[in-house]
C-alpha cells in the first residue's frame, strides 16, 4: 500500500529533526530536484508507488495505477490501448509532464500530451508523482504535475509470470537481474500482452457505418540494462527498451474512403549515464535517444498505403545535473538540452521539423529552525518561441511537533505543439501557455492518522484554442481552477486504510463554463489486510459528474455525464515461498459508465495470474 512518510529528515543525516510518525526510514525520491532526498523534505504533495503496490493491485495498465492516486482523473476512449488522457488537479492533459527515468516521454512531442495507454506496465518498477507546478525544474508541460516512471529494478533474481482474464486477455512475462562479479549487474525483461477487447461503440462518432467489432490490443516489450560501479563514488549505466503495439479502434468512416481503424506503434529508447555520488557533492551526466513511429491505417490496405498516416519523431537529450549539501539543505544547478526531429507528414505538418530547447536551472532547499524553505528558477531558450523563465517557492512551518503548515507559489508553462505551430491550421506566432499557482496546506499525525489537507488555485492564461471561423489557433483562452485535496492513511488492527478526496472547480475564465471531462469530485479508498496467508485488497472509487461534447451532430452539444461508484476486489495467496497466485474482479458490480461521451467502458472483468520467483 502507499505509505506517506512524515519524518522531517535531512538532505544529510543530521540536518533535520524527526517529524514524528513511525520508526521506518523516510522514503527517498529523486523527481523533485533530480537527486535523492527524503520525501518529507519535498513540500509539494508527493506520492510514491512501488512494484509491490502494482502487484498487490494486480494492475494491467499504467492508467489503472494512476487512477488510484490523489488529484488524478483518467479518461479513455474504451478499454486497453485506447486513447486516454490524464488530468491532474483539473489542468489539461497536455499540462502533465511524463518522464521515463527522468527523461521526457517522446510520444508527447507530437500531440502535446502523453497517452500512457500505450506504455507497458511490465516496465514500471516505481512511480513518483508530484502535484503542482514543476516547470522551474523541468521546463515545459509541468503545470498540473509530474509523473516519473522509473524502470530500474532494485531486487536481484528471476521472475516468470503469466495471467489470463476477461475478453481473452493473456499476459506472459520473464524478467531477471543478475550480478556479474561484485560491481556489475545486468537486467533483462521480455513481456507479451494481448486482449481481444470489446466493441467500444462510439455512438454516432463513427460516421455512416456501424463498426460492431472487438477493439483489441497487442503489446510486445523488450528491456535491458547494464550497471557498473567503478568505485564507491563513481558509477555508470546503459539502458534500452522498446515496444511494438497494435490497437484496433472505432474510427470515423466516410463512404468511399479507407477506414483507418488500426494503430501500430513502434517505440525504442536508449540512455546512458555517468554518476558521481560523494558525501557532499553529487553529479550526473545522462544522454538519451528515443525514436517512435506511430501508424494509423486501414488493415485492408496496410500501413504503407497512401491513405495511412505516420507520426515519426526522434528525440535527443543531454542532462547535466549537480547537487551540493550546504548547511541544513542543498543547492542544485544544471543544464539540459533537447532536440526533437520529425519526418514530413507528422502531426499533419507537410514538412519535417527540428526543434531545440536548452534550459538552465537552479534549486535550493534549506532548514532553518522549525522552517523549511524550497525554491527553484529556470530559463529555457527554445528555437521556436525564444526565451521563457519560470520560478517557484515554498515554505513549511512545523508550528507544533508533528504538525506543519505549507504555503507555495509557482509559475509554469506549456509550449505549443507541432500541429498548433505548423499544421494546416497552425499559427507559428503562438506563445506558450502560462500558469500561476497558489497552494496552502496543513499536514500532521493525529491519533495514528497521517493526513494532509490542501487548497489551491491555478490561473492559466494564453491557452491555445482553435477558432472555427478563422480556422486558426490563437492564444486567447483562460482557465481558472480552484480545488481542495485531502489525503489520509492509517491502520486499524490488521487493516490498512488509504483514502483521498478531491474537489475540483475547473472553469473557462472567460465564459465561466466547466472545463470538459473533469470530474468535479472524486473519492478514492484502498483497504488492505492479510487473513490466513491470503492478502486481500478492496479498492473503491467515486467519480463525480462531468461534462463532455456530443460530436455526433453539429453544432456540438454539451452533455452532462453522471457520477459512478466502482469497486475492485483482489486477493493473492503464496502457495510456496516462490510461487504466488492472484485473482481480481474489476468493476465488481458491473457498473455501466463512460469517461468519454459515446465510448463504453469494459464492465466487470476477471483476471487470474501467477508468478514464480527464484
From Swiss-Prot:
Q: Where does the UniProt annotation locate this protein?
A: Cell outer membrane
Q: Which NCBIfam families match?
A: PRK10641.1, TonB-B12
Q: What is this protein called?
A: Vitamin B12 transporter BtuB
Signal peptide coordinates: 1-20
Limits of the TBDR beta-barrel domain:
155-614
Residues reported in the UniProt entry to bind cyanocob(III)alamin: 83, 85, 92, 110-111, 251, 309, 517, 551
What SUPFAM superfamilies does the entry give? Porins (SSF56935)
What lineage does the source organism belong to?
Bacteria, Pseudomonadati, Pseudomonadota, Gammaproteobacteria, Enterobacterales
Residues involved in Ca(2+) 2 binding: 213, 215, 249-250, 261
Q: Kindly give the Gene3D superfamilies that the UniProt entry links to this protein.
A: TonB-dependent receptor, beta-barrel domain, TonB-dependent receptor, plug domain
Enumerate the UniProt keywords alphabetically: Calcium, Cell outer membrane, Ion transport, Membrane, Metal-binding, Porin, Signal, TonB box, Transmembrane, Transmembrane beta strand, Transport
Tell me, in a sentence or two, what this protein's role is. Answer: Involved in the active translocation of vitamin B12 (cyanocobalamin) across the outer membrane to the periplasmic space. It derives its energy for transport by interacting with the trans-periplasmic membrane protein TonB.
Membrane topology type: Multi-pass membrane protein
Q: What stretches pass through the bilayer?
A: 158-165, 169-178, 184-195, 217-227, 232-248, 263-277, 279-296, 309-325, 328-337, 353-369, 371-381, 385-400, 403-417, 434-443, 449-458, 473-490, 494-509, 517-529, 535-550, 558-572, 585-596, 602-614
User: Could you provide one GO biological process annotation from this protein's UniProt record?
Assistant: monoatomic ion transport
Binding positions (Ca(2+) 1): 199, 211, 213, 215, 250
A Pfam family that this protein carries is TonB_dep_Rec_b-barrel
In Gene Ontology terms, what is one molecular function of this protein?
A: metal ion binding
TBDR plug domain location: 38-152
Query: Position of motif TonB box?
Result: 26-33
UniProt motif (TonB C-terminal box) ranges: 597-614
Amino acid at each position: 500500500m502507499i505509505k506517506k512518510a512524515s519524518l522531517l529528515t535531512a538532505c544529510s543525516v543530521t540536518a533535520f529533526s524527526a517529524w514524528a510518525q513511525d520508526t521506518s526510514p523516510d522514503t527517498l525520491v529523486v523527481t523533485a530536484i533530480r537527486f535523492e532526498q527524503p520525501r518529507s523534505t519535498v513540500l509539494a504533495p508527493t506520492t510514491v508507488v512501488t512494484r509491490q503496490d502494482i502487484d498487490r493491485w494486480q494492475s494491467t495498465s499504467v492508467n489503472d495505477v494512476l487512477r488510484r492516486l490523489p488529484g488524478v482523473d483518467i479518461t479513455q476512449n474504451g478499454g486497453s490501448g485506447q486513447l486516454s488522457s490524464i488530468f491532474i488537479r483539473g489542468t489539461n492533459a497536455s499540462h502533465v509532464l511524463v518522464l521515463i527515468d527522468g527523461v521526457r516521454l517522446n510520444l508527447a512531442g507530437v500531440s502535446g500530451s502523453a497517452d500512457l495507454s500505450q506504455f507497458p506496465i511490465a516496465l514500471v518498477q516505481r512511480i513518483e508523482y508530484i502535484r503542482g507546478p514543476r516547470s522551474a525544474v523541468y521546463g515545459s508541460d509541468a503545470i498540473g504535475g509530474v509523473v516519473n516512471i522509473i524502470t530500474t529494478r532494485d531486487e536481484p533474481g528471476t521472475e516468470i509470470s503469466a495471467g489470463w482474464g476477461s475478453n481473452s486477455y493473456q499476459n506472459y512475462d520473464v524478467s531477471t537481474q543478475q550480478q556479474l562479479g561484485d560491481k556489475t549487474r545486468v537486467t533483462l525483461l521480455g513481456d507479451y500482452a494481448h486482449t481481444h477487447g470489446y466493441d467500444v461503440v462510439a455512438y454516432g462518432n463513427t460516421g455512416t457505418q456501424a463498426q460492431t467489432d472487438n477493439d483489441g490490443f497487442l503489446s510486445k516489450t523488450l528491456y535491458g540494462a547494464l550497471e557498473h560501479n567503478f568505485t564507491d563514488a563513481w558509477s555508470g549505466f546503459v539502458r534500452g527498451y522498446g515496444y511494438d503495439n497494435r490497437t484496433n479502434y472505432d474510427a470515423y468512416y466516410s463512404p468511399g474512403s479507407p477506414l483507418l481503424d488500426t494503430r501500430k506503434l513502434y517505440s525504442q529508447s536508449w540512455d546512458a549515464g555517468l554518476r558521481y555520488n560523494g558525501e557532499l557533492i553529487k553529479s550526473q551526466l545522462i544522454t538519451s535517444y528515443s525514436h517512435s513511429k506511430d501508424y494509423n491505417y486501414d488493415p485492408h490496405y496496410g500501413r504503407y498505403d497512401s491513405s495511412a498516416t505516420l507520426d515519426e519523431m526522434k528525440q535527443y537529450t543531454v542532462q547535466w545535473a549537480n547537487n551540493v549539501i550546504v548547511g541544513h539543505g542543498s543547492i542544485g544547478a544544471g543544464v539540459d538540452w533537447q532536440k526533437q526531429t520529425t519526418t514530413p507528414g507528422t502531426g499533419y505538418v507537410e514538412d519535417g521539423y527540428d526543434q531545440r530547447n536548452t534550459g538552465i536551472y537552479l534549486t535550493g532547499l534549506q532548514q532553518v529552525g522549525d522552517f523549511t524553505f524550497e525554491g527553484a528558477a529556470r530559463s529555457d531558450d527554445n528555437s521556436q518561441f525564444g526565451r521563457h523563465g519560470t520560478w517557484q517557492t515554498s515554505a513549511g512551518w512545523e508550528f507544533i511537533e508533528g504538525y506543519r503548515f505549507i504555503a507555495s507559489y509557482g509559475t509554469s508553462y506549456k509550449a505549443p505543439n507541432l500541429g498548433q505551430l505548423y499544421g494546416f491550421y497552425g499559427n507559428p506566432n503562438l506563445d506558450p501557455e502560462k500558469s500561476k499557482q497558489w497552494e496552502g496546506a496543513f499536514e500532521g499525525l493525529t491519533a495514528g492518522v497521517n493526513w494532509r489537507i490542501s487548497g489551491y488555485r491555478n490561473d492559466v492564461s494564453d491557452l491555445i484554442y482553435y477558432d472555427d471561423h478563422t480556422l486558426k489557433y490563437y492564444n486567447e483562452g483562460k482557465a481558472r481552477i480552484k480545488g481542495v485535496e485531502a489525503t489520509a492513511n492509517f491502520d486499524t488492527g490488521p487493516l490498512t486504510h488509504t483514502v483521498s478526496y478531491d474537489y475540483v472547480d475547473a472553469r473557462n475564465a472567460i465564459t465561466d463554463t466547466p472545463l470538459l471531462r473533469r470530474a468535479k469530485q472524486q473519492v478514492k479508498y484502498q483497504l488492505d489486510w492479510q487473513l490466513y496467508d491470503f492478502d486481500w485488497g478492496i479498492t473503491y472509487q467515486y467519480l463525480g459528474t462531468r461534462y463532455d461534447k456530443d460530436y455526433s451532430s453539429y453544432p456540438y452539444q454539451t452533455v452532462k455525464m453522471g457520477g459512478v461508484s466502482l469497486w475492485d476486489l483482489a486477493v493473492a495467496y503464496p502457495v510456496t515461498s516462490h510461487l504466488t497466485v492472484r485473482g481480481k474482479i474489476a468493476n465488481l458490480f458491473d457498473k455501466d459508465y463512460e469517461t468519454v461521451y459515446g465510448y463504453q467502458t469494459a464492465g466487470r472483468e476477471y483476471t487470474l495470474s501467477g508468478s514464480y520467483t527464484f
